[in-house]
């Protein structure tokens, strides 16, 4: 792999790890090696989000994570198939939209972390 492919924030053999304002997130899982790498690291992330469509995992999800006061902490235009977010314990609102179909979930992140699954079916 060339240097650009292995640099943080670029596509390649590594998953993407990027800071967004004060929130660090990991987004990827499109290929089998990338998905397996993310699953191995999942326990280290307080909020673990997966996106599924009718045939399987989907990417290109519009994602927003807001705190209990409504302040947006993370906004992605191309989330998935998995997005892990480093958050402090607390209450959050997560909104995910795929092909114009939005879903919103209220989630409490605690010491064990929290898994969220968003599914879109025809």
Task: List each model region and its residues.
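A short tyrosine-centered beta-strand micro-motif
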Residues: 90-96
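Hydrophobic loop/turn residues within beta-sheet-rich immunoglobulin-like superfamily modules
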Residues: 87-90, 108-110
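Short beta-strand segments within Ig-like beta-sandwich modules, predominantly Fibronectin type-III
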Residues: 73-78, 108
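Short, surface-exposed beta-strand/beta-hairpin micro-motifs centered on an aromatic residue
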Residues: 80-86
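Short amphipathic beta-strand segments in non-cytosolic proteins
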Residues: 62-73
